[in-house]
Amino acid sequence: MQQEYYDLDLERAILSSCIMSEEAYASIAGDISPKDFSLKAHQDIFKAVIACSNNKEPISVSFLRKHKKIDEQILAEILATPSMIDLPAYVNELHEKSVKRQLLSFAHLLPTRINEDRAVSEIADEIGKEIFSITNRVNSRDIKDVDMVISELFEEFKKQKTLEN
């Protein structure tokens, strides 16, 4: 049985939730990246969502268009998709499919790498590093992006300063 390593309905539901609720996006922002989406148009829309968030702009259609050229048909499909309640489960499934796609893509390169005229230890070391790079995100999903941490820290400092006054 051929397994699918992408789910466009799943991707649309995640994007719909992020667009409909900034809180939903904030809850999963560090868990996925644009490359986790299999469809380039979905990657572009998620990049625009990230840009809106980073610029402290509303995550809305008008602002999304400002940051990235958006495929209007794909955006309409996303907006017609109901947002979901169990977003973390959907995000986890998206991430799992993404890692499997990356591993499958890497596996296709192995015969070429193995046939290179280099020492086996060098080839094995390189392959090990690449596999670690792909799978490391699976084990470090709770680690937030440094820009996000600094932004959150700065916001907390502002709140504390306001409370002191």
Where are these regions (language model features)?
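The Walker A/P-loop phosphate-binding site
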Residues: 141-165
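Signal for well-folded cores of large energy- and translation-related assemblies
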Residues: 19, 95, 132-135, 154, ...
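Interdomain "pre-motor" coupling segment immediately N-terminal to P-loop NTPase/helicase cores
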Residues: 83-150
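Noncatalytic partner-interaction/assembly domains of nucleic-acid and motor enzyme complexes
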Residues: 1-99
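Phenylalanine-focused residue identity feature
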Residues: 37, 46, 63, 106, ...
